[in-house]
A protein has these predicted regions:
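N-terminal accessory targeting/assembly segments
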Residues: 1-110
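C-terminal-of-GTPase-core extension/linker across diverse P-loop GTPases
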Residues: 1-13, 138-209, 215, 301-412
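Switch II of P-loop NTPase G domains
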Residues: 2-3, 26-29, 52-68, 234, ...
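Conserved nucleotide-binding/hydrolysis micro-motifs of P-loop NTPases
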Residues: 17-21, 50-52, 84-87, 106-109, ...
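Flexible beta-alpha connector loops of hexameric P-loop NTPases
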Residues: 18-22, 54-57, 115-119, 160, ...
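Conserved C-terminal guanine-recognition region of P-loop GTPase G domains, centered on the G4
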Residues: 28-34, 68-71, 85-95, 245-246, ...
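Short alpha-helix plus adjacent loop in nuclease-associated cores
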Residues: 107-125
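Switch I (effector-binding) loop of TRAFAC-class P-loop GTPase G-domains
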Residues: 186, 193-199, 218-247, 262-267, ...
């Protein structure tokens, strides 16, 4: 939200592991990846085991002294805490350490601000940042760390921001109003899409699982992809043809991550819910990631929150070229490598097989006088066999329940 000059940020990561905490190592590794994605140089990390977080400084006083020495010795410019800090903890840590301190939530918000491309995406990120910022305003101003620039202070195209409570509340109201207009337009487009006979596929998965690679492979078009977190923010929908003429739409949206800030979930709800209005969900999982089971649980949990559990699902374990003797946790599944030469044909075959399970089988006698209508039928159905007879042909295939009326056009 505040424009600053670019310079290298040397960061120190801090994590506190409470008793019985799951996935602490994963969380710390992700924090390092997030920091690198934001452009920081991760110098080191400090970990501490405690029964509870210190209410004043998050870590214990002894550990805080060690951290202060490290900050001075290694010329640390930013400390990133792997947890949501209270405003009080944030201010106290900065006073003791003498450098900018941000938490995991602020870091993720910062990356989203970097990645936002569309008008809607920028509005959603800006709204999430303001909601995060509001309880952290001190009096009529903002904590000093926000004036320091760099990681944690970036915004979607905004150079200056008048930071006081009334201003922030007014901006939140204004952005929410703008988003309602955008969401109304999105709902209109979605309604037309739902009325369409076209089969709809949604890609979901943990961030950096390879969804954009699969999207590019199937569409033969280029969408930004990189080995980094949150490379894609905006929902993207493209049309493709499978098995000849069957037309389907493919939608890719923002990847998930554990502890996704509630401000982002709220702001991006309409974008996340794009995957809710599909006929088939393709859950993409990075099989090479040692924490893929935890990733799966996170995605399934968010799917549950968005009421997406009952949508037919195809599970794809991606990056098969990087693993050996892989054991899946979800059944049924397919193990693929989206970047391999034959991946396009493999993906198309997998999708067609799954669609056949969803569609209903049919057998249709088509007289030669109506054969010209077969081309239109192919766009909404999978034609399995065509047996030519003296007076026409017999077609067997699969079609969606909502499109079975299309078969009536061939009846005498």
């Amino acid at each position: 939200m505040i424009e600053t000059e670019k310079k290298e940020e040397r960061v120190l990561l801090i994590g506190v592991e409470l008793q019985g905490m799951d996935n602490f190592d994963l969380s710390m590794e992700e924090l390092a990846s997030l920091a690198k994605t934001a452009g920081a140089v991760v110098v080191d990390s400090y970990r501490q085991k405690r029964e509870k977080y210190d209410s004043k400084t998050f870590v214990g006083s002894g550990k805080l002294e060690e951290i202060a020495l490290m900050v001075d010795a290694e010329e640390i410019t930013t400390v990133i805490v792997n947890n949501r800090l209270t405003p009080r903890q944030n201010v106290n840590l900065e006073e003791v350490l003498g450098v900018k301190v941000i938490d995991r939530m602020q870091l993720i918000l910062d990356i989203f601000a970097m990645r936002a491309r569309s008008h809607e995406g920028k509005l959603q990120v800006h709204l999430a940042q303001l909601k995060y910022l509001l309880p952290r305003l001190v009096g009529q101003g903002i904590m000093l760390s926000r004036q320091a620039g760099g990681i944690g202070s970036r915004g979607p195209g905004e150079s200056q921001l008048e930071l006081n409570r009334r201003s922030v509340r007014n901006q939140i109201t204004d952005i929410e109003r703008q988003l309602k207009v955008v969401e109304k337009n999105r709902a209109t487009v979605r309604e037309k899409r739902l009325e369409s006979s076209t089969f709809k596929i949604g890609l979901i998965g943990y961030t950096n699982a390879g969804k954009s690679t699969i999207m590019n492979t199937l569409t033969s078009k280029t969408q930004y992809e990189a080995n980094e977190l949150f490379a894609t923010l905006d929902a993207t929908t493209k049309s493709i043809h499978l098995g000849g003429n069957l037309k389907v739409t493919l939608t890719d949206t923002v990847g998930f991550i554990q502890d996704l800030p509630t401000e982002l979930v709220s702001s991006f709800k309409s974008t996340l819910e794009e995957s809710k209005y599909v006929d088939l969900l393709v859950h993409v999982i990075d099989a090479s990631n040692p924490y893929h089971e935890e990733h799966e649980k996170t995605v399934l949990s968010i799917m549950k929150d968005l009421d997406m559990e009952d949508i037919p699902r195809l599970t794809l374990y991606n990056k098969a070229d990087l693993v050996e003797n892989f054991t899946p946790t979800q059944m049924p599944f397919a193990l693929i490598s989206a970047k391999s030469k034959d991946s396009r044909e493999q993906l198309q075959a997998l999708l067609l097989d799954k669609i056949k399970e969803i569609f209903e089988p049919f057998t249709l006698r088509v007289p030669f006088s109506k054969s010209y209508k077969i081309h239109d039928l192919e766009s909404v159905a999978i034609l399995e066999e065509r047996d030519y007879q003296d007076d026409g042909e017999i077609i067997t295939g699969y079609i969606a329940e909502k499109n079975k009326w299309r078969l009536e056009e061939f009846y005498d």
